[in-house]
């Protein structure tokens, strides 16, 4: 079977990670998601918690000044160094063989590959709020605002590192609505498209 890579970007709590995992299982290829955090924690200066919070999300405003002013001798912030290490790891994972990579600007980092299927997963707000509750995530008084804030931070992170709008249709080969089709159907569509690459 030919070497191919799937990238899955997703709205927070849209079941994108689940869909990526299901598609990878159907295709018999690895899915790289939270293991990316573990690999980076082992191979870089960064703690796992820092990677989890800063590997896909722009910093909170209260931490912005600290991170802007905390630059090394090359002028890079910790988040810049993390992005560079993460991008290098994504290129290594893609070079090793067929796989699914979730988030982390992967479709941008791997944009020069001709064997790439770029997917975006979204869901309606009610489904995302339900998913938030299923995952027992403390969203405070406003789950909807929590989800909007998480997506806004992803969007800001993506733009800061790519100069491209996160979620814009032109950046993906297909966008799927998981609340309309369900996780299994979305995964099946991805697997079918992968086989046609």
Where are the regions a protein language model picked out?
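Domain-scale detector for complete catalytic domains at protein termini or as standalone homologs
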Residues: 1-6, 65-76, 83-84, 88-91, ...
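Pre-Walker A (Motif I) flank of P-loop NTPase domains
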Residues: 2-11, 97
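Glycine-rich phosphate-binding P-loop
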Residues: 8-24
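Short beta-strand-centered segment that lines the nucleotide-binding/catalytic pocket of NTP-utilizing
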Residues: 30-41
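ATP-dependent small-molecule kinase phosphotransfer cores
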Residues: 41-98
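Small-molecule kinase domains that catalyze NTP-dependent phosphoryl transfer to phosphate-bearing small molecules
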Residues: 58-67, 139-184
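Short, amphipathic alpha-helical "lid/cap" segments that border enzyme active or binding sites
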Residues: 87, 183-191
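ATP-dependent NMP and nucleoside kinases share a basic, alpha-helical "lid"
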Residues: 89-136
